[in-house]
């Protein structure tokens, strides 16, 4: 019996992260029967910070850096990430070898009772400056309250009465079989999702050409192009997880439409921009949308946000 070559996949230990890693594992093994994948769970620095605000501790990169360290130390062959947790640019030693076909990118509202009875001054849980900014436009009288933890933890806090509603990503709920908890889907053109929301990225070392070739069979072209356009917006703006930036791209008939926003956390200022172009020019479209945001006052807004 021929022994199968083992591929080591590193991921976070949350139920959603493990689901994503298992999905990638199955995709690899189905496409390459001579390979066997092993999942290595890692508790990242972001997972260990259960009470502090991410914005005070280094941002979403804290969910990614320990996984990247495992790649660089050659303790793993690939790392599976939620793209929205990753910085706009990869370092020279690492690259995203595959963008898995995107799940539903929308944000959703989960309510403790019924949506129809949600009061105007409801306490809504979110830790995202982007969501806070847009919630203040959607529900001006609402009170935003910080919430941390994985999907299950956040739902438990809602059920325990700490919040009257919370905002989560549709993709995570659907992947975990919790779609029945969703009360309302936000329109992604009005309440713009996070950059890369709903997309899974499989990262490998830049010098591992064998792994890059293997991952090509998993790569979804449309997802890659959409995420490339979205990430280009943030790359040009130089935003981080403290900045209320959002971008969402869709492709139809090889035409890529990109919607983006930049605003203040309190929702009093929201700048929007849209651009349509050939999908193969995804990065150029992203840069153009970012330039439009800057020209509309985004430059001074970013300086103000970084003070």
From Swiss-Prot:
InterPro entries attached to this UniProt entry: HemC (IPR000860), Porphobilin_deaminase_cofac_BS (IPR022419), Porphobilin_deaminase_N (IPR022417), Porphobilinogen_deaminase_C (IPR022418), Porphobilinogen_deaminase_C_sf (IPR036803)
Entry keyword ATP-binding: no
Chain segments annotated as transmembrane: none
Record-linked PROSITE patterns: PORPHOBILINOGEN_DEAM
Matches recorded under Pfam families: Porphobil_deam, Porphobil_deamC
SUPFAM superfamilies, A to Z: Periplasmic binding protein-like II (SSF53850), Porphobilinogen deaminase (hydroxymethylbilane synthase), C-terminal domain (SSF54782)
Chemical reaction(s) catalysed: 4 porphobilinogen + H2O = hydroxymethylbilane + 4 NH4(+)
Single GO MF annotation: hydroxymethylbilane synthase activity
Record pathway: Porphyrin-containing compound metabolism; protoporphyrin-IX biosynthesis; coproporphyrinogen-III from 5-aminolevulinate: step 2/4
This protein's GO CC annotations: cytoplasm
S-(dipyrrolylmethanemethyl)cysteine, modified sites: 241
Coiled coil: none
EC number: 2.5.1.61
Additional information: The porphobilinogen subunits are added to the dipyrromethane group.
Subunit record text: Monomer.
NCBIfam families xref list: hemC (TIGR00212)
Name of the protein: Porphobilinogen deaminase
Organism: Coxiella burnetii (strain RSA 493 / Nine Mile phase I)
This protein's encoding gene: hemC
